[in-house]
Curated annotation (Swiss-Prot):
InterPro entries: SecB, SecB-like_sf. One of the proteins required for the normal export of preproteins out of the cell cytoplasm. It is a molecular chaperone that binds to a subset of precursor proteins, maintaining them in a translocation-competent state. It also specifically binds to its receptor SecA. It comes from Dechloromonas aromatica (strain RCB). It holds the Pfam family SecB. This is Protein-export protein SecB. It comes from the Bacteria. GO terms for cellular component: cytoplasm.
Amino acid sequence: MEQNEQPVFGIEKLYVKDLSVEVPNAPEIFLEREQPQVEIQLNTGGRAVGDGVYEVVLTVTVTAKMPEKTVFLVEVGQAGIFRIQNVPEEQLEPLIAVACPNILFPYAREAVSDAVSRAGFQPIVLQPVNFEGMYMQRLQEQAGAPAEVPIQ
């Protein structure tokens, strides 16, 4: 195999593509003593931006609510530009859906924690995420759950 045919996977750039913080009920919300319910949503997406160059965005949305009130909403779009070349077609999607988000996640976690604390709240520490499991689940959903065959 020639040098230019070797598989290439590299990080070109990491950056925050989107950062949004909302505290719609400030300052009154800071007087509340009740613990809010925290909901975390993750989404990943990727697109080609050049020959063998892909942008992958990991979006983390954290919403803290009390009954009938939003405490805060933080959304971080942590992005990266990745060079992926000479990789078999069947390996490209798993790289974009699993490997790239695994690289982006620590940066997104730090951005979320920082944004929440700068908004005046205790930092949120995001637990590690199984992106491979999320990818496999999405593949199963796209393929449709296999019909169960009764055992006789």
